Amino acid sequence: QERAIFGILQQYARSGLFETAYLVDNMIVENFLGDIPVAGYYDGLNDIIVSTFHMINVFENTEPLIGTIQKPQESSRIATIGVASFESGEENLFYPFDLVREKAYYYAINKEKLESDGSLIKKIKTQIKSKMQDNVRVSYGIFPTNYEDDYIFCKAYTSKVQLEKEEEKEENNS
């Protein structure tokens, strides 16, 4: 029953009944966070998911200093969120899509760093160029923050209904 609902909700999004269906895999979020105490397990998972959604929502309603976040194509209504390392560019999406059509990167950069680091734009453009592959449409925005650390939040979109992991295993064994 859960599998059916998982697929049906994605089909509803694809048909336009829902604007977007967001997929998150708790195991992937757990692996990203590392060791989480049992007592705070769900709080830890929910904190990173909610804060990532919150920051993306803030940036989607804020004009970027540089860059443009493109609206996804009409057919790309299944999405996930994630974070990336500013230093390495390594990306951690909260759901493993089979086929990514579009990605948006939200660079949350310390305001003082934006005003003083002359090599910053080159580093960001290099990271963005490295993400442009396999016919994936990529957009980005750079946003000033008062945070001490720099963050990259990301959103990935697909038009393909995603199978649950158990279904994929069954198909591979057939």
Predicted regions and their residues:
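Tubulin/FtsZ superfamily GTPase core signature
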Residues: 1-174
